[in-house]
């Protein structure tokens, strides 16, 4: 199937909070940690069809495990190339063009890569917002972000040990529903999702 990747950034007072001094900020890493924690249940909003899980297999540039990284298409949450770099990517790609002087720090995003075309967009975006907020609320968020960061292709044979240390995404709608049942209290907090709505998603 086709992926439905979601790029997101956190903005405060009109300023992108994803970078600090040219590197991914603590704010961004906490948000990523929240997504790492709730990733299994987010599939209930973003992968709602049995065939969704045929896509989430190794060597398809689709995620299979709960991890994140820079410019890495084997991870669940990817930090895209270029925005934090001091090099002008436009000039590198188009050497005959004059160097641009745009402030690209406002463009930095992170990309959630598990959802597909079966997603309920309203539920998915609400679920991602809940996950990011959850990352700000848990005390060990930065430890989670550190533990789930990978800088290798986890599906290459030499990285088997790293792969085994990472939690797996659900492999079916039934497994996804079980994950949502276990983590439902986080989504029901602050009345973002009602218990009846969560029940309906689980039963579906």
Can you annotate each of these PLM segments?
Residues 1-13:
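Histidine-centered divalent-metal-coordination microenvironment in nucleic-acid enzymes
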Residues 20-204:
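C-terminal accessory/tail domains of diverse enzymes
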């Amino acid at each position: 199937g086709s992926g439905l990747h979601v790029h997101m950034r956190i903005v405060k007072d009109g300023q992108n909070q994803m970078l600090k001094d040219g590197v991914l900020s603590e704010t961004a890493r906490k948000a990523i940690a929240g997504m790492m924690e709730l990733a299994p249940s987010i599939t209930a909003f973003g992968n709602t069809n049995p065939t969704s899980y045929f896509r989430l297999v190794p060597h398809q540039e689709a995620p299979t495990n709960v991890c994140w990284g820079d410019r890495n298409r084997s991870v669940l949450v990817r930090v895209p190339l270029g925005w934090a770099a001091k090099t002008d990517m436009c000039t590198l790609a188009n050497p005959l063009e004059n160097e641009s002087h745009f402030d690209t720090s406002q463009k930095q995003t992170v990309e959630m890569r598990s959802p597909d075309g079966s997603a309920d967009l309203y539920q998915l975006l609400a679920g991602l917002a809940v996950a990011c907020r959850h990352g700000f609320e848990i005390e060990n968020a930065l430890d989670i972000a550190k533990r789930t960061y990978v800088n290798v292709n986890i599906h290459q044979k030499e990285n088997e040990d790293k792969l085994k240390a990472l939690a797996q995404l659900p492999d079916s709608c039934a497994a996804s529903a079980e994950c949502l049942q276990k983590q439902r209290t986080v989504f029901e907090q602050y009345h973002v999702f009602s218990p009846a709505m969560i029940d309906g998603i689980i039963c579906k």
